[in-house]
Amino acid sequence: MITAELTVIPLGTCSTSLSSYVAAAVEALKKLNVRYEISGMGTLLEAEDLDELMEAVKAAHEAVLQAGSDRVYTTLKIDDRRDADRGLRDKVESVKEKI
């Protein structure tokens, strides 16, 4: 299981509101076989393998461009753990057990 944090930022928009661009990216993710969680600062992803993750990243990136942005800045953090099959909720629960 691969977990990741994705942030896609449209640049040069005429507004400080970015929710319509985020919505376009999420609509693109809905069409794929990845689990996602939206947060106030980015989107968390779970994928079975790197190819599946990168397909989702590309889809979200392209969706923001298609939504009208002429320039997009995308950041991606990947946790590719292969010794155990742990998802996003497992990570949160592990911390909660310790506090």
Swiss-Prot record:
Cited Pfam families: Thiamine_BP
Gene Ontology CC annotations of this record: cytosol
Superkingdom in the source lineage: Archaea
PANTHER family to which the protein is assigned, alphabetical: UPF0045 PROTEIN ECM15
Assembly and oligomerization: Homotetramer.
Family per similarity comment: Belongs to the UPF0045 family.
Protein name: UPF0045 protein MTH_1187
Source organism: Methanothermobacter thermautotrophicus (strain ATCC 29096 / DSM 1053 / JCM 10044 / NBRC 100330 / Delta H)
